[in-house]
Amino acid sequence: MNKITRSLIIFNIFCVVCAQQSKALKPGSERSEGKGPFKRMVIRGGTLINGDGSPPIGPVDIVIENNRINRVQSVGYPGVPINENRRPKKGDFEIDASGHYILPGFVDLHAHAGSPQKAPDTDYVYKLWLAHGVTTVRGVGLANLEFSLSEKNRSKLNTITAPRIWAYQRPGQGKDWRGGRVQDPQAARKWVRYA
């Protein structure tokens, strides 16, 4: 191989590597769809499969207050008219789940938000999770530290359409971290305070 051909190959490889490095993971877009959060939401008349292996129960009314399930109230029996006296009071927002099954949100314990090369648009990843019933993710390296903490906070504030995010990072990550590798308890404490 002559010098010019070899130089062109090396230059092209260098350009490809630099182009890949310059891409960045795109944070979630500001929320433009969906409803909520609500101070008090009630899901009415559904059949609950609670995930513990017991048979489905229902119809039930589920009361969600301040983004937490507050109460699951049995309001009758299948095939029998619902006893209106057993129903919880009205919510700010209500969903009629009659004839539908209600499942708890799934939790993905090992999640990544994508990568600039494969899935640079986190909106796609977040909506894919939500569409499959995943309402909480444990990001084990969701992305870099700063990105992960920012997305976690934005999800908590409900400014993006995304599941709840729990950011679990590898000790020693962070663009401003100057403590080197975390290899002992003192360095671990220092990094936790940093993060």
Language model features by range: what are they?
Residues 118:
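Short coil/turn segments
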Residues 1-9:
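Bacterial N-terminal signal peptides that target proteins for export
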Residues 37, 97, 101-102, 106-109, ...:
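Divalent-metal coordination cores built from histidine and acidic residues
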Residues 25-28, 33-39, 48, 52-103:
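Histidine-rich, glycine-flanked metal-binding segment
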Residues 113-114:
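Short active-site segment of divalent metal-dependent hydrolases/proteases
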Residues 19-20, 24:
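Boundary at the C-terminal end of the N-terminal hydrophobic targeting segment
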Residues 8-16:
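Bacterial N-terminal signal peptides
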